[in-house]
Amino acid sequence: EAAQKGIHWMRLTAKGRAGHGSMMNDENALTALSEAVAKIGRYNWPQRYTKVVKDLFKRVAQATGRPYDENDLRPLLREIGPTARMIGATLQNTANPTMLEAGYKANVIPGTASAVIDGRFLPGYEEELNSTIKSIIGPDISIETISRDIALEVDFAGDLVESMCSAITEFDPEGIPVPYLMSGGTDNKALSDLGIIGYGFSPLRLPEDLDFMALFHGVDERVPIEGLEFGVKV
């Protein structure tokens, strides 16, 4: 892992006119918020390819014999199996609604309603994320930053990288080390503030039929013991 998306968790709040649920109300905060959240969830973000992402897909194309089109890398996603679930998210910014909060009783129209959005931006595209969210929701819904962290991207080169690559091929001669951009984040963000260049290195060898990415924060989150044993050797 030679790059990471940045993080912007934000709370959206809509205000309206509180009232009885049995009456007409054209200033329903929950209705306004729901419409904004739906627009965010369905928004089709433009493709943005960073240096690390291009490097990854060039190597995928070389390994599979498939054509490489630097203007559209999405066709190559089918060549990387379940990993495409995460890698696909590194071709663009993302913003996923994750939490909703409004009201306290079935027959009361709330005066306010809020939602939490998990925004992730590519290196160099934080402003695109923020400005797009603002344009989607309009001026009547407020945005509050819950948490924000930087994006990272470093060169996939140097003695440390060579050591990682040689360790993998020593225990798996058919293994092809490639860089990738992580859709989440690690402590490397904090280390970068100290001038320390860090890489993610998790040498797990996983069964071909395991959709490993689907297990992240999912039901029965786990990792095969054989994969860990391989990683310890590496």
Describe the role of every protein-language-model region.
Residues 2-231:
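Metal-dependent amide/peptide-bond hydrolase catalytic core
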